[in-house]
């Protein structure tokens, strides 16, 4: 399992919310030799099926990353923007961004006085693409075009940092599972769209797939950095088995079976209670008449920033836990 190469490939693909096609094509190319069926639905979800005679298990990992959409272009060629997903404003200023067509720019803000706070509202931010006039800017970028933080994977040995690690890390787990899994159950792996703006892709896919069990793969925040308010999730101590978050109380039987799977596989895991945020697990739980659902999370520092950081051993542990669970 060369999880680093998988992570690098998926993290470098352009894919803000609503514009996940390039990510999907990268993933499709990686899994095509291990699937019985590959298809796309109307929302752009990539649905990869390995047929089996047992239960139908839906495994969901969202492809989309946070980003920005152009709302207007002023007379001096600066692009006004609106967030796609939950942008951490305090780490956005001065960052490089890229559009799907390759145009690059930098984000800054209206300087109304000398010095001052850098925690500014998004309405005061803009993207500078080097244009001097509105016409010059519109020749490169249109209103409605989306941008993301420019890709840049940092290999720190035992850890990797990158934009889009939320949730390309979860996608990498599903890719590695498909490459090596032995089960009689039917696995429907959904690489979902538009999670960052309301679990939209998973909601549609779950209704279509109609699973017996649902499992989401996603990252979860850590609080193991200096002076952070600590909670139970830290890097390097294994993936988490989620108990609940603000959108989902995980099915107790699914939680129990995940814990048992971790113990059988010899995988260290962490119990997770997340008081804010949600995952595709909530969309699966509420589809049709309801689905027993759970979540396996990968601890991640600096979520929703350009330097989302994971421990490689935690990602590998998530693969091993999930492989044992789906048996």
PLM features: residue spans?
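N-terminal hydrophobic/helix-forming segments and targeting peptides
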Residues: 1-327
């Amino acid at each position: 399992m060369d999880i680093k190469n998988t992570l690098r490939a998926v993290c470098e693909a352009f894919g803000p919310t609503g514009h996940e096609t390039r990510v999907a094509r990268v993933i499709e190319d990686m899994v095509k030799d291990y699937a019985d069926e590959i298809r796309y639905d109307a929302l752009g979800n990539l649905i990869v099926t390995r047929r089996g005679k047992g239960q139908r298990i839906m495994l969901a990992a969202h492809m989309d990353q946070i980003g920005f959409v152009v709302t207007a272009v002023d007379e001096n060629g600066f692009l006004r923007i609106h967030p796609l997903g939950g942008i951490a404003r305090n780490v956005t200023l001065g960052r490089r961004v890229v559009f799907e067509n390759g145009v690059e720019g930098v984000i800054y803000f209206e300087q109304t006085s000398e010095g001052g706070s850098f925690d500014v509202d998004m309405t005061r931010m803009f993207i500078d693409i080097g244009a001097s006039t509105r016409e010059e800017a519109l020749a490169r970028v249109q209103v409605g075009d989306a941008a993301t933080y420019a890709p840049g994977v940092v290999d720190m040995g035992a850890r990797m940092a990158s934009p889009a690690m939320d949730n390309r890390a979860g996608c990498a787990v599903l890719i590695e599972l498909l490459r090596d899994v032995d089960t009689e159950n039917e696995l429907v792996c959904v690489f979902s769209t538009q999670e960052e703006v309301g679990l939209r892709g998973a909601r549609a896919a779950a209704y279509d797939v109609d699973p017996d069990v649902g499992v989401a793969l996603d990252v979860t925040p850590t609080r193991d950095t200096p002076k952070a308010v600590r909670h139970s999730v830290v890097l390097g101590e294994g993936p988490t088995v989620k108990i609940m978050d603000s959108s989902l109380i995980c099915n107790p039987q699914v939680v129990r079976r995940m814990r048992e799977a971790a113990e059988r596989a010899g995988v260290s895991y962490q119990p997770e209670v997340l008081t804010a945020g949600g995952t595709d697990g909530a969309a699966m739980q509420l589809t049709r008449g309801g689905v027993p659902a759970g979540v396996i999370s990968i601890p991640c520092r600096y979520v929703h920033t350009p330097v989302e950081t994971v421990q490689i051993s935690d990602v590998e542990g998530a693969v091993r836990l999930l492989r044992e669970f789906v048996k």
